[in-house]
């Protein structure tokens, strides 16, 4: 009798352990693959990419990323977008406006979380930034253009004519320049506006601008960001100050910025994506999110190279990029 009871207890214990193992296995997160398409490689978009990945990992989600870079090619974007939809991924991340537009054109059902998009409504990705009403949501890289212009005028107080170079095909760039024009009225400044179509245009365009303006402003433009070392080589040689739309461009030879932190923007987008996967939200009702705090950054090497002395008032609040 004792032996039988011992056998029953032993069997029960084994079955209990097996049940625990089965329960643990069942509780383990099911691996999920999501798509992530990036328009092109440059520091800002790379930082956003890392922010997305880090945020998803921090949430403890068992996610694998199908990482694709379109190399600024529209046909690549289209092919990547269509393949992601065909794979029936439960979520697609898109970095930069053209990437988001391409994925949105490929599907109106799969949830899309985008970042590095200046204005989602202007880009026709959502019906309203506060109430998207589509399968798209995300984080905006709208930068503080007014504060950037104020910094420019502190660094170059006698400036009368400002130049700007951007890609006219990027809606986000046109949106920022429209803001710049309104803000320039406060200082009674004249604007010299030149556009480029691709990276190859930047060198000649920059050469034609330096010497004709007192300073240059460049927005968060993907073509200019990719060509920033080329632009900076020309402007620094001409001792022409360049105020940039974000920190990566400033670090690549610009003089100063009050910039967007693309890593944090990526983290915001990553957490929004995690909420969607966990069933805590849907793009249709998730408002576009924005960065609320910005830091002034000065490229110390560039300042010395072009002979700009940083006013004491600026040194009190700005951080220096060594």
Model-derived segments and spans:
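C-terminal segment of classical bacterial N-terminal signal peptides
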Residues: 15-25
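Short hydrophobic alpha-helices and adjacent helix-cap/hinge residues
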Residues: 2-5, 11, 26-322
